[in-house]
Amino acid sequence: MTLRFYDTASATIKDFVPVHPGEARLYYCGATVQGAPHIGHVRSALVFDVLARWLRFRGLEVTTVRNVTDIDDKILVNSRASYEQDYSGDHAREPWWALAYRFEGVFGQAYAALGIDRPTYEPRATGHVPEMHALIQELIDAGHAYPATDGSGDVYFDVRSWPRYGELTRQRVEDMQDAPDADPRGKRDPRDFALWKGRKEDEPLSASWDSPWGRGRPGWHLECSAMAGKYLGAHFDIHGGGLDLRFPHHENELAQSTAAGREFANFWLHNGLVTYEGEKMSKSIGNTVSPQDMLREARPLAVRYYLGQAHYRSVLDYRPTSLQEATAAVERVEAVLVAARAAGLGLDRDTQDVPAEFVAVMDDDLNVPRALAVLHETVRAANSALATGDHDAARPLVAAVAGMSDVLGLLQLMDLEGAGAGGAEHRALDVLVQDLLAQRAAARTARDWASADRIRDQLAAAGVVVKDGAQGSAWSVES
């Protein structure tokens, strides 16, 4: 069966034909590192992690790009807020770039804990300002962008100059809301959006760059177009992100890229949002859930299973029992592999043996719910064969379970050495250590260095060594 995906732009499921034969090039929007992640951020990253894994399984050479937006209005606002809330006098104001780097690490720790692969490239917006300047100049030269005439230093995309504007979300310009990213003064049309934002007097000098239009910083939409073009070329296969990014972010990306003469993405894939008991997650309501919250309640294996179990285009609803149910389901898969090892059946963690039905449903718009149904069906058959001692029948079934678990990113998080008390003891210890690491991460986020050091020392006294890295903290037992 041919790979097929739902393309938001055409609102149809289309056959996937790579731009470059034998390759798949994928760009998906990463974090704006203004604060700690919630489960919606992690779900999106996991969706595109599974997509990349499946494309590789199908024999394609996959290049992935997940950007980091490390300069943004909200980052500057939160940096100012962190200063205003610091009454101790012990610390100077946290610079915007330090806040961004700190939360980039928190995101990385969440990704790593859930086995989400590092992308081929993970570019920061601040490292690609020259490419953004070049794209702006192309648009000005083509008559699709203009510097504001009010002396602000802003540069805007002229939506009226591009007849295709609105094609991604199938809207007419007349029906769109005004762009919220800048004052309407200096614009030709209220819906024109900022490509470059002139520096304001109350903003740090370090948060701006010299440009032909004056000192300032790039607009959010421009950042992604410039970085996608640099790493994937003018024409690539898939652009992805959360459903909430379709408009205005992805609409504006598409417009400025195609207006500059780039074909841009063949497919636009959008994952559904996450709700809490049917309601939108909101800080004001107080119903947001963080990856750390989930990892305190369940193993990374169960959290990954939960976040990936719904179809990527569906809403994923979180309930207090969600992780308990996910734990029960995925540990049935893990248990059959542990039982197979105990019975003397070898297990290759890199096996690629999967049933034809699994391949068919994954090829059909990445239908993970149906793929999980095939997985659990195979688990039941393998358990029956093991129970009767029919190892010849069990062997291919166990290999299929391992292969499907590997493709879905579950196998790497399983404790297949745990046939007996040792594995259970390790899991129990991991729960305790992860809780302490979460407390330590919270202390570091609050810049409470004394508490963070005290937790590290407590762990060290118990023989647990903590290593901090760019992707978060890892632990091991001192030998």
Swiss-Prot record:
Substrates-to-products reaction catalysed: tRNA(Cys) + L-cysteine + ATP = L-cysteinyl-tRNA(Cys) + AMP + diphosphate
Key words, A-Z: Aminoacyl-tRNA synthetase, ATP-binding, Cytoplasm, Ligase, Metal-binding, Nucleotide-binding, Protein biosynthesis, Zinc
Gene name of the encoded protein: cysS
Enzyme class at the top of the EC tree: ligase
Ligand binding (Zn(2+)): 29, 224, 249, 253
This protein's name: Cysteine--tRNA ligase
Compositionally skewed regions (Basic and acidic residues) per UniProt: 182-197
Cofactor list: Zn(2+)
Locus of motif 'HIGH' region: 31-41
